[in-house]
Amino acid sequence: VAPEEHPVLLTEAPLNPK
């Protein structure tokens, strides 16, 4: 699963704030 799919979990790098 790409980090772009779940940017919410990767709050350390909010590249895609959906």
Curated annotation (Swiss-Prot):
Q: What reaction gets catalysed by this protein? A: ATP + H2O = ADP + phosphate + H(+)
EC class name: hydrolase
Entry GO terms, CC: cytoplasm; cytoskeleton
The GO molecular function terms of this record are: ATP binding; hydrolase activity
* Record bears the keyword Lyase: no
Q: What is its EC number?
A: 3.6.4.-
Compartment annotation: Cytoplasm, Cytoskeleton
Which keywords does this Swiss-Prot/TrEMBL entry list? ATP-binding, Cytoplasm, Cytoskeleton, Hydrolase, Nucleotide-binding
Q: What does this protein do?
A: Actins are highly conserved proteins that are involved in various types of cell motility and are ubiquitously expressed in all eukaryotic cells. Essential component of cell cytoskeleton; plays an important role in cytoplasmic streaming, cell shape determination, cell division, organelle movement and extension growth.
Regarding protein family, the annotation reads:
Belongs to the actin family.
Q: What is this protein called?
A: Actin homolog
The species is Crocodylus siamensis (Siamese crocodile)
